[in-house]
Regions:
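Long, intrinsically disordered, Lys/Arg- and Ser/Thr/Pro-rich regulatory tracts
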Residues: 1-40, 345, 358, 382, ...
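Active-site-adjacent bridging/hinge elements
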Residues: 102-106, 222-228, 296-306, 556-568
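Conserved AAA+ ATPase small/helical "lid" subdomain
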Residues: 313-318, 456-458, 489-501, 505-587, ...
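Short hinge/gating elements
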Residues: 115, 166-175, 183, 192, ...
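Long, low-complexity, serine/threonine- and charged-residue-rich intrinsically disordered N-terminal tails
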Residues: 1-231, 235-247, 252, 257-264, ...
Length: 678
């Protein structure tokens, strides 16, 4: 008895010191509405286990290892405070006080952490644990009984009136544990009957969580044998709609075995949820630091060498430099800001040889923080099933695009997709959201419902180009053959890169020699170079670049704005093509990404030049050449295997820079007022 009194005294002292007592007073003021009379009143109390242990170790141990008993202690103290301070007349018994303890954190020890990869999961003490995982499925919000009032059927029993028999939901309890018709009065043993008009309902949502490493299997390759299994979270009341499919969360919850005869399900009652993103910002490797110092005299050389040396195990140098640069820019630019705004850069590759490029894109996918390789036979966005935990509502499962949230979704060969699937992908590319239709009759609802989910990933696609008779290679690249995909689809993609059609037999021979060398001497470096970088070096570089915060210089902004206006007018006059506002976003994304890849924090005019060249090549592939005459591989116009080649490339890019300025002055009158002539 003395120990119980001491614990309650510690609870009262903690509530007073932490502000919980004042919050109780404020919450009770909201209950004084005479129109609202309930059987149970819910109070949320935030508890910090570290502070509790410091105040009273016994109470801290009770909260961490026996939360149900701790809840009863807080309930008793809260009821005593309500009656002593006369906070409300609506609460007559302690049973009407429904206290929910919200954990702010847990001690950073293994016994308070649940690894979602650990097996088997057996019944243990119902105490809070912390876990991290990705949301892969969620249900619609349904109702559950938060609390109910029962009256004794014996009129002579004092429990036939008042609020003596109150049942509230407890973690791990089913609906039948809270409300059913076989409860017995504690005083006279007569049957109890629910007073339905006092039933209090709350919101409930089921969510499936899985270890983030499980998504590595979907990159297209896997190492070792692992077993991954999702865990079901029960979200209640204010936690409903607090998560999004595809996002990574840190959850504090209480594991429980839910009995639904004849089955028994292991699940977790969520207590608190917070968005969790690993804040890793690795340093750039010494090799890249050395390269950065060596190329400091030119704003273009660092990114050129980084792209040139990328993926040498899969393709010989100089063969797909533009594509490799585009993939690196997409990796760097794909990120979510602190304000939850998402930045993406979609890449569509047009080629006549898809095998090598598919391998190169798959290898690039391994550098992404999260990368999903979609199978044409699988679900791209969402799928529906019936919930298996008794709710009977629709369970929405994430497809490849939603699982790739914050990363890259690789579509592979678009020739494998049917027209309706391509139309759906095009719609998502344009709106960055996907709608899910839920038929009400099928899933136990009165009305149909349509939900919308944001799609926050970059898409990589591949299409075979058709060979046109009579077509010859020239310095000016015309409209590309996009194979089975419509022109509107390519327009929605943004950046389009053509590979393989102009390099001819020489490139085929180089690729064949490279493949044979790698097969006969795997792991060796077939092209000795002063600059050699490992896959880990590239992973660290991409991760570091993603975290860089950049600002747009006035010179870069003016060049981008001037090119957009000039290109829009030139193409409208000569081709009747209207350049959309999406081109501005593409130009800014390319310029920012190139700035980051060069490890700068200020977007220079030279970054804007690279963005303009890539964008102009992309628009040319879709709509044909314009008055701005640039070579097909404008960013890599010459071989750069040595210092002389790098210098020659700088000179060509300087000339192209001047061509862009002349194009702007010609087709955007007035541009000379804000762009300084060089």
């Amino acid at each position: 008895m003395t120990e119980l009194f001491t614990l309650k005294e510690s609870v009262l002292f903690y509530l007073d010191r932490s502000g919980g007592l004042q919050k109780l007073v404020d919450d009770c003021k909201l209950l004084n509405d005479p129109q609202q009379v309930d059987a149970v009143y819910r109070f949320k109390i935030s508890v910090n286990p570290s502070d509790l242990i410091e105040l009273d170790p016994v109470l801290g141990h009770c909260v961490l290892h026996d939360p149900l008993r701790a809840t009863v202690l807080f309930q008793s103290v809260c009821f005593l405070a309500i009656k002593t301070l006369s906070l409300t007349e609506k609460i007559q018994t302690a049973s009407q006080v429904n206290v929910t303890l919200i954990f702010t954190n847990l001690p950073p020890f293994p016994e308070y952490t649940l690894d979602l990869c650990s097996f088997p999961r057996v019944y243990g003490p119902m105490r809070p644990v912390s876990m991290e995982g990705v949301v892969i499925a969620m249900t619609r919000i349904t109702k559950y009984t938060q609390g109910a009032r029962f009256l004794c059927t014996n009129d002579d029993c004092p429990c036939s009136t008042g609020f003596h028999h109150i049942r509230v939901h407890a973690p791990g309890a089913t609906e039948s544990a809270t409300v059913r018709n076989d409860f017995i009065c504690m005083i006279c043993s007569s049957q109890l009957k629910e007073d339905v008009k006092f039933r209090v309902l709350g919101d409930k949502q089921l969510v499936e969580l899985i270890h983030v490493e499980a998504l590595d299997v979907l990159r297209g390759h896997r190492h070792g044998s692992f077993r991954y299994q999702s865990v079901t979270l029960f979200l209640r009341d204010e936690l409903c709609n607090s998560v999004r499919i595809g996002r990574l969360y840190k959850v504090i919850g209480i594991p429980a075995l839910v009995h639904q005869w004849p089955n028994m399900t292991w699940s977790v009652e969520a207590n608190s949820i917070q968005l969790w993103e690993p804040k890793d910002c690795p340093e750039v490797s010494p090799r890249f630091q050395q390269l950065l110092n060596w190329t400091a005299s030119s704003p273009w050389r660092f990114s050129a060498i980084v792209a040139h040396c990328f993926g040498l195990d899969l393709a010989p140098p100089a063969l797909y430099n533009t594509l490799k640069l585009g993939l690196l820019l997409s990796l760097v630019q794909t990120r979510t800001d602190a304000d939850d705004s998402f930045h993406s850069l979609d890449v569509l590759v047009v080629t006549s040889d898809a095998l090598i490029l598919d391998r190169l894109m798959t290898f690039s996918l391994s550098l992404a923080r999260r990368g999903i390789r979609h199978q044409a036979s699988g679900e791209m966005f969402t799928s529906l099933s019936r919930d298996e935990h008794g709710a009977g509502t629709a369970n929405i499962h994430a497809g490849s695009a939603l699982l790739a949230t914050g990363g890259i979704c690789m579509l592979g060969d678009l020739g494998c997709y049917k027209k309706d699937k391509l139309d759906h992908i095009q719609s998502v590319l344009e709106s960055h959201s996907v709608s899910v239709f839920i038929p009400g009759k099928k899933y136990g609802e009165d009305a149909d419902q349509q939900l919308s989910f944001p799609v926050q990933c970059s898409f990589w696609g591949l299409t075979h180009s058709s060979q046109c008779s009579g077509r010859t290679d020239s310095a000016v690249l015309g409209t590309a053959e996009l194979g089975p995909i419509p022109a509107q689809f390519a327009e929605a993609f943004g950046l389009v890169i053509q590979c393989g059609d102009r390099v001819g037999e020489q490139a085929v021979h180089a690729q064949s020699v490279h493949t044979l060398q790698q097969a006969m001497q795997p792991g060796t470096q077939p092209y000795p170079s002063h600059w050699e970088f490992s896959t880990q070096d590239y992973k660290e570089l991409v991760a570091h670049c993603q975290n860089l915060q950049v600002e747009l210089s006035p010179e870069a902004e003016k060049l981008i704005h001037g090119y957009y206006m000039a290109s829009r007018r030139a193409r409208t006059q000569s081709q009747g093509v209207k350049i959309s506002l999406a081109s501005i976003k593409l130009l800014l994304s390319l310029a920012e990404a190139h700035c980051k890849l060069c490890l700068r924090t200020r977007v220079l005019e030279e970054d804007a030049v690279v963005a303009v060249l890539l964008c102009e090549n992309s628009v040319t592939l879709k709509h044909g050449a314009s008055a701005l005459i640039i070579p097909p591989d404008a960013v890599f116009p010459c071989d750069m295997g040595d210092m002389e080649g790098l210098q020659r490339r700088d000179m060509i890019l300087d000339e192209l820079h001047q061509n862009i300025l002349r194009f702007i002055y010609t087709y955007a009158p007035g541009a000379d007022t804000y762009i300084a002539e060089e």
